[in-house]
């Protein structure tokens, strides 16, 4: 397994798909990285030469991925909560942030339904 940005990427898959195992790299970004590195999308990871691996690593190092990206996202959310914006309040309360309806759904964000005690007579 090749190791890129601290992530073991699978040997048997095509490089364009294997790069998506790194947090922050999707298919479009993966294609751009390979084009900039001059590597074909169809080649398998196990067939990469050491020079090609180094070229891919250099391109990935130029992008914010993995821990740095996670840290930036968490800091952005924390900043929203500190300034008291609407989005920050929704994050703090554990409710949907992007305007979704919460009357019936939003169970993933709100957690398991809790019965109201003393509702029955």
UniProtKB/Swiss-Prot annotation:
One of its GO terms (biological process) is translation. Coiled coil: none annotated. Keywords: Ribonucleoprotein, Ribosomal protein, RNA-binding, rRNA-binding, tRNA-binding. It comes from the Bacteria. Residues 106-121 have a biased composition (Basic residues). PROSITE patterns: RIBOSOMAL_S13_1, RIBOSOMAL_S13_2. GO terms for cellular component: cytosol; small ribosomal subunit. Disulfide bonds: none annotated. InterPro entries: Rbsml_uS13_C, Ribosomal_uS13, Ribosomal_uS13-like_H2TH, Ribosomal_uS13_bac-type, Ribosomal_uS13_CS. Residues 96-121 are annotated as: Disordered. One of its GO terms (molecular function) is structural constituent of ribosome. Located at the top of the head of the 30S subunit, it contacts several helices of the 16S rRNA. In the 70S ribosome it contacts the 23S rRNA (bridge B1a) and protein L5 of the 50S subunit (bridge B1b), connecting the 2 subunits; these bridges are implicated in subunit movement. Contacts the tRNAs in the A and P-sites. Belongs to the universal ribosomal protein uS13 family. HAMAP family: Ribosomal_uS13. Part of the 30S ribosomal subunit. Forms a loose heterodimer with protein S19. Forms two bridges to the 50S subunit in the 70S ribosome. PANTHER family: 30S RIBOSOMAL PROTEIN S13/40S RIBOSOMAL PROTEIN S18, SMALL RIBOSOMAL SUBUNIT PROTEIN US13M. This is Small ribosomal subunit protein uS13. It comes from Streptococcus gordonii (strain Challis / ATCC 35105 / BCRC 15272 / CH1 / DL1 / V288).
């Amino acid at each position: 397994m090749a190791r890129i940005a601290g992530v073991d990427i699978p040997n048997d898959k095509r490089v364009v798909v294997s790069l998506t195992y790194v947090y922050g790299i999707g298919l479009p970004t993966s294609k751009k990285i390979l084009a900039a590195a001059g590597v074909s999308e169809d080649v398998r990871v196990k067939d990469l030469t050491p020079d090609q691996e180094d070229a891919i690593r250099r391109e990935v190092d130029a992008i914010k991925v993995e821990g740095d990206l996670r840290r930036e996202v968490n800091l952005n959310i924390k900043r929203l909560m500190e300034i008291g914006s609407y989005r920050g309040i929704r994050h703090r309360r554990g409710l949907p942030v992007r305007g979704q309806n919460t009357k019936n759904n939003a169970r993933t964000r709100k957690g398991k339904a809790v019965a109201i005690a003393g509702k029955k007579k």
